């Protein structure tokens, strides 16, 4: 029997608008309780923190996510690691949060966050967000299958971490 609490890694896609509309007193507390529950079970949570930075500079520790509430909440409230990809970064919290560090240059290919999570047989949690509203896991599958309608595009974004220049993507 597979239960979410048996997971070592959970990749979370979320949309908390409905939860926040129903829980007006302190909606963030519910999210914090959920994340702390998972961490206490030894689960590493990985969350999209996409900034879509295609030009200029991306600061791993400072650039805010444009992918909703959860990543920015985690970056404010938890000790986290964030991947260095300027468009499609991820934050991770928990025992094995370093899984998102030092990823490859491809957002969806070999040595991407998706690739690493796949190798770890991770669980996937769509929280209040239907799969029909999009999911980048599909892009990983497309890239590793070399579909003919996808192509690589490079952007000249400078990546910084802890005030140190890492590279240009």
Where are these regions (language model features)?
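N-terminal and secondary-structure boundary signal
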Residues: 1-169
